[in-house]
Amino acid sequence: MKNILIIGATGQIGSELTMNLRSIYGNDHVVAGYIKGAEPKGELLESGPSEICDITNAQNIADVVNKYNIDTIYNLAALLSVVAEGKPLLAWHIGIGGLWNVLEVAREHGCAVFTPSSIGSFGPGTPAYKTPQDTIQRPKTIYGISKVTGELLSDYYYNKYGVDTRSVRFPGLISNVTPPGGGTTDYAVDIYYSAVRGEKFICPIAQGTYMDMMYMPDALNACVQLMEADPARLVHRNSFNIASMSFEPNQIYETIREELPGFQMEYQVDPLKQSIASSWPDCLDDMCARKEWDWKPQFDLHSMTLDMLEKLSARLKA
């Protein structure tokens, strides 16, 4: 039975991944790591163990690993893309300094490590359509630079020390549970909230700007599936392209209007978000993930929209 530590367990991905992993491996086998000021609440707190686990403090991480006999670490501590641009030193301190701490603890204690990368690891020189698994990256944001560095550092620890590091490059993630928190792709979450509330949506991303997106249930499955994959099949480790759907703002708007014909949207482009979005690929080629660990998403734009509207409507009425 795995003993898992999730660092950043109260964040956008971590809060849902923690509950998902507890449903698979048992509540007592998944520790929710958090920092002061971001304590777990409700079911996340009550369903299993939680510990302060500051990624910038290697001894703190080691203490939690020892206490719970941890063998697998999901490292989800990071600043989101737009937030990171306003706090570049902090973004690097958490994203790279913190990752180094995690990898050192993993090396000393024999832990496997999952540290997600992102479509933000690519830059304007990257082939935009069907972005290959192995290609030029050269991102222009501190978020992307830290993601590329994290990929390389994780591979270094695997090649030099044998640490079982694995990773995926997440597209923009869309959740019906966790509210948006400052990412470039978060417009694709905000738009559903506006639709369910009967409000006009003000879109910060220009029409025609395609980005890869993924529904959170598929993202959670990818995390688990990759960490359970046979290591003998893995040619790539850090980090796999994974894809589900690619769309631009008007497409998601029209898909919502099929269910809510009165929904309205107008564009007020945010220059910072747009500059970041324009530097990212339109869609990724994920054939390596499909070949090496049988990756296959379950949701497309239409099925995600139906589920988002249903789940958000029920939640906002409760």
How would you label these PLM feature ranges?
Residues 204-206, 212-318:
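C-terminal substrate-binding subdomain of Rossmann-fold SDR/epimerase-dehydratase oxidoreductases
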Residues 75, 100-142:
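Conserved Rossmann-fold NAD(P)-dependent oxidoreductase catalytic core, especially the SDR/UDP-sugar
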Residues 25-39:
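Conserved glycine-rich Rossmann-like NAD(P)H-binding loop of the short-chain dehydrogenase/reductase
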Residues 4-24:
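N-terminal Rossmann NAD(P)H-binding glycine-rich loop of SDR-like oxidoreductase domains
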Residues 92-99, 146-147:
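Short alpha-helix in the Rossmann-fold core of NAD(P)-dependent oxidoreductases
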Residues 45-57:
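Rossmann-fold cofactor-recognition segment
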Residues 55-94:
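NAD(P)H-binding glycine-rich loop region in Rossmannoid oxidoreductase-like domains
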Residues 155-210, 216-220:
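NAD(P)-dependent short-chain dehydrogenase/reductase
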